């Protein structure tokens, strides 16, 4: 452990991370970044004796700052060609899924992309969710995808019937669970599973050195091995990635 801390101290002293409102993975509580991923980042930085700051921003601004190298890291990040081009990505930390939701009065249930023909599908984007949805619809015509600025607004619009009687939305199931419980959106129901997904932390290729990235990964490995990472995730009802 001493060697790990000594090596990491020489690699970096201050890191600036950005994230978004994506509860329970990350969210703001006043001026404090809270949620599972901020706890994991803070625990890793404490282990490494790094000074780390986490800022909660609208996703597009956070992503732009990270891609431009204005900040060191960003989360949550999926495995995709665009993300790998811009970021060094940690091993996946948490696994979840993208599910469909609709009004209880709608009998829609998703089994395959063809089921979405003739439907308007709402999704938060541009985001990892919208990327995965659009990839799944490449060979499926007659589907209108509507991008919405955040998941909270997405579910409120669905609840208000803004996507029509046959409208559906797709979003992260853990985010949906959190928002439905906290906003009492019990007129909504799960309408099927799109795909499983895992998230990690991205480090800007324009800002962070390979040595810094490797040191952070070693810190994450220590948290994984001593059970602290799983304990943090379980506190938020989340599943560690394999």
Language-model-detected regions and their locations in the chain:
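Extracytoplasmic small-molecule ligand-binding "clamshell" domains
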Residues: 12-81, 85, 147, 226, ...
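Short loop->beta-strand "edge-of-pocket" segments that line small-molecule binding or catalytic clefts
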Residues: 15-27, 113-129
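Periplasmic-binding protein-like
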Residues: 19-21, 95-99, 182-220, 239-242
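Extended ligand-binding regions for polar small-molecule ligands
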Residues: 38-47, 114-120, 127, 202-235
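Ligand-binding cleft/hinge of the Venus flytrap
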Residues: 41-50, 91, 128-150, 159-161, ...
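Acidic, polar ligand-binding/catalytic clefts
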Residues: 42, 54-115, 127-129, 191-192
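Hydrophobic residues within well-ordered alpha-helices
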Residues: 44, 66-67, 116, 157-162, ...
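A ligand-binding cleft/hinge motif common to bilobed small-molecule-binding domains
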Residues: 64-67, 76-86, 134, 165-195
């Amino acid at each position: 452990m001493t060697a790990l801390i000594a090596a990491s101290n020489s690699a970096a002293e201050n890191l600036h991370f950005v994230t978004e409102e994506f509860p329970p993975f990350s969210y703001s509580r006043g001026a404090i970044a809270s949620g599972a991923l901020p706890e994991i980042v803070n625990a890793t930085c404490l282990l490494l004796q790094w000074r780390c700051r986490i800022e909660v921003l609208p996703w597009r601004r956070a992503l732009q700052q990270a891609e431009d190298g204005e900040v060191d890291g960003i989360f949550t990040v999926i495995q995709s060609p665009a993300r790998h081009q811009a970021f060094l990505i940690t091993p996946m930390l948490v696994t979840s899924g993208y599910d469909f939701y609709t009004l209880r009065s709608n009998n829609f249930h998703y089994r395959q992309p063809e089921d979405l023909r003739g439907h308007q599908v709402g999704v938060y984007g541009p985001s990892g969710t919208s990327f995965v949805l659009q990839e799944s619809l490449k060979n499926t015509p007659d589907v209108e995808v509507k991008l919405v600025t955040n998941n909270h607004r997405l579910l409120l619009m669905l609840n208000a019937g803004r996507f029509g009687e046959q409208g559906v939305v797709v979003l992260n199931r853990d985010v949906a669970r959190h928002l439905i419980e906290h906003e009492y959106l019990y007129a909504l129901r799960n309408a099927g599973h799109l795909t499983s997904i895992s998230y990690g932390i991205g480090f800007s290729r324009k800002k962070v050195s390979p040595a810094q990235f490797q040191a952070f990964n070693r810190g994450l490995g220590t948290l994984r091995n001593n059970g602290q990472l799983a304990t943090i995730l379980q506190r938020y009802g989340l599943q560690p990635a394999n």
